[in-house]
């Protein structure tokens, strides 16, 4: 242990009997030696290598202030990252995590204000809900128990620090303190790694499912496009047939009108009946029956009918 400057009381105290001043000076000397030793140990590496800014240690969770309290909300930017990260990872599975974050940061900066405001509004809504739940939790019995437990742990730590100082003054190693300083670290690390592995496995499984669903979706989209094309083709054919039907109906109406007008001067023999648009079919049947009964007698009528039919056919067919 390196020795720094001691207090005058500690340097000039007699070595014989124990006096109150001697005990206090010894405590101060021990504290200074510990403080200066730690400073000397910290100073050396800093002179050799500049201190780098480091984030929260990897694999170590931040301590939750309220273990049973409501989950803290995330910002609008974090909501955007959580929503888009898996989509980018699916499209670019080989892209490292920092590159994905960098890509999403650039995408966020170029995002339209209206779209960006949507995430900010959702984050603000979640924040207000969190404040309500936090206030309700602070009024609950669980919060009181939690704060009491935190206070008890704080007192235990202070007692442990006092016990460490007493042990040093008595010349013993701080076995209990060393055991407390490494408390639960291996267990925590193993549990964290197991949880992280399980989470990564679940993410891989979900990504595979997502890829399978996207492939099925692509197949269904192709079928849908094919069905849509077939439906459009059938609709076009139906429209064409409807136009043809309408044209034929108009042509038929024109032929019936021409026949009615042409046969108006040609009554049925024996009855004197002439056709109208409503009775044209009945008239033609009666005329055909009269001619078949005695063709020789109605030769002039037959010639007249042929002449009318030829003229109507040339004009309307």
UniProtKB/Swiss-Prot annotation:
<feature type="coiled-coil region">
    <location>
        <begin position="190"/>
        <end position="257"/>
    </location>
</feature>
<feature type="DNA-binding region" description="HMG box">
    <location>
        <begin position="70"/>
        <end position="138"/>
    </location>
</feature>
<dbReference type="GO" id="GO:0006338">
    <property type="term" value="P:chromatin remodeling"/>
</dbReference>
<dbReference type="InterPro" id="IPR009071">
    <property type="entry name" value="HMG_box_dom"/>
</dbReference>
<keyword id="KW-0175">Coiled coil</keyword>
<keyword id="KW-0238">DNA-binding</keyword>
<dbReference type="GO" id="GO:0006355">
    <property type="term" value="P:regulation of DNA-templated transcription"/>
</dbReference>
<dbReference type="GO" id="GO:0000794">
    <property type="term" value="C:condensed nuclear chromosome"/>
</dbReference>
<dbReference type="GO" id="GO:0000400">
    <property type="term" value="F:four-way junction DNA binding"/>
</dbReference>
<keyword id="KW-0805">Transcription regulation</keyword>
<keyword id="KW-1017">Isopeptide bond</keyword>
<dbReference type="GO" id="GO:0016604">
    <property type="term" value="C:nuclear body"/>
</dbReference>
<feature type="cross-link" description="Glycyl lysine isopeptide (Lys-Gly) (interchain with G-Cter in SUMO2)">
    <location>
        <position position="31"/>
    </location>
</feature>
<protein>
    <recommendedName>
        <fullName>SWI/SNF-related matrix-associated actin-dependent regulator of chromatin subfamily E member 1-related</fullName>
    </recommendedName>
</protein>
<keyword id="KW-0156">Chromatin regulator</keyword>
<keyword id="KW-0158">Chromosome</keyword>
<feature type="compositionally biased region" description="Basic residues">
    <location>
        <begin position="53"/>
        <end position="65"/>
    </location>
</feature>
<dbReference type="GO" id="GO:0002111">
    <property type="term" value="C:BRCA2-BRAF35 complex"/>
</dbReference>
<dbReference type="GO" id="GO:0005634">
    <property type="term" value="C:nucleus"/>
</dbReference>
<dbReference type="GO" id="GO:0033234">
    <property type="term" value="P:negative regulation of protein sumoylation"/>
</dbReference>
<feature type="compositionally biased region" description="Basic and acidic residues">
    <location>
        <begin position="31"/>
        <end position="52"/>
    </location>
</feature>
<dbReference type="InterPro" id="IPR036910">
    <property type="entry name" value="HMG_box_dom_sf"/>
</dbReference>
<keyword id="KW-0804">Transcription</keyword>
<dbReference type="GO" id="GO:0006325">
    <property type="term" value="P:chromatin organization"/>
</dbReference>
<comment type="subunit">
    <text>Component of a BHC histone deacetylase complex that contains HDAC1, HDAC2, HMG20B/BRAF35, KDM1A, RCOR1/CoREST and PHF21A/BHC80. The BHC complex may also contain ZMYM2, ZNF217, ZMYM3, GSE1 and GTF2I. Interacts with the BRCA2 tumor suppressor protein. Interacts with DTNB.</text>
</comment>
<keyword id="KW-0832">Ubl conjugation</keyword>
<keyword id="KW-0131">Cell cycle</keyword>
<dbReference type="GO" id="GO:0003677">
    <property type="term" value="F:DNA binding"/>
</dbReference>
<comment type="function">
    <text>Required for correct progression through G2 phase of the cell cycle and entry into mitosis. Required for RCOR1/CoREST mediated repression of neuronal specific gene promoters.</text>
</comment>
<feature type="region of interest" description="Disordered">
    <location>
        <begin position="1"/>
        <end position="71"/>
    </location>
</feature>
<dbReference type="GO" id="GO:0035914">
    <property type="term" value="P:skeletal muscle cell differentiation"/>
</dbReference>
<keyword id="KW-0539">Nucleus</keyword>
<dbReference type="GO" id="GO:0016925">
    <property type="term" value="P:protein sumoylation"/>
</dbReference>
<dbReference type="GO" id="GO:0045666">
    <property type="term" value="P:positive regulation of neuron differentiation"/>
</dbReference>
<dbReference type="Pfam" id="PF00505">
    <property type="entry name" value="HMG_box"/>
</dbReference>
<keyword id="KW-0597">Phosphoprotein</keyword>
<feature type="modified residue" description="Phosphoserine">
    <location>
        <position position="160"/>
    </location>
</feature>
<feature type="compositionally biased region" description="Low complexity">
    <location>
        <begin position="1"/>
        <end position="22"/>
    </location>
</feature>
<dbReference type="InterPro" id="IPR051965">
    <property type="entry name" value="ChromReg_NeuronalGeneExpr"/>
</dbReference>
């Amino acid at each position: 242990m390196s020795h720094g400057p001691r207090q005058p009381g500690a340097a000039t105290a007699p070595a014989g009997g124990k006096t109150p001043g001697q005990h206090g000076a010894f405590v101060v000397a021990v504290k200074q030696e510990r403080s200066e030793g730690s400073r000397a140990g910290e100073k050396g590496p800093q002179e050799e290598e500049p201190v780098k800014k480091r984030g929260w240690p990897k694999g170590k969770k931040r301590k939750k202030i309220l273990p049973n309290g409501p989950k803290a909300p995330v910002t609008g930017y974090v909501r955007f990252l959580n929503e888009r990260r898996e989509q980018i990872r699916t499209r670019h599975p080989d892209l490292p995590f920092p590159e994905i974050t960098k890509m999403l940061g650039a995408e966020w900066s170029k995002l339209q204000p209206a779209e960006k405001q949507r995430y900010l509004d959702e984050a603000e809504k979640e924040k207000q809900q969190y404040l309500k739940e936090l206030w309700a939790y602070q009024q609950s019995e669980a919060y009181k128990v939690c704060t009491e437990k935190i206070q008890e742990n704080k007192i235990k730590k202070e007692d442990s620090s006092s016990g460490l100082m007493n042990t040093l003054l008595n010349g013993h190693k701080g076995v209990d303190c060393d055991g407390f300083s490494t408390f639960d670290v291996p267990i925590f690390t193993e549990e964290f790694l197991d949880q992280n592995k399980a989470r990564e496995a679940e993410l891989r499984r979900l990504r595979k499912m997502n890829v399978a669903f996207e492939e099925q979706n692509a197949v269904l989209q192709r079928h849908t496009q094919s069905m849509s094309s077939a439906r459009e083709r059938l609709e076009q054919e139906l429209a064409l047939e409807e136009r043809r039907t309408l044209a034929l109906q108009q042509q038929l109406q024109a032929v019936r009108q021409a026949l009615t007008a042409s046969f108006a001067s040609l009554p049925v023999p024996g009855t004197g009946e002439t056709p109208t648009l409503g009775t044209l079919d009945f008239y033609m049947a009666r005329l055909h029956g009269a001619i078949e009964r005695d063709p020789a007698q109605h030769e002039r009528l037959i010639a007249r009918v042929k002449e009318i039919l030829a003229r109507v056919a040339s004009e309307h067919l």
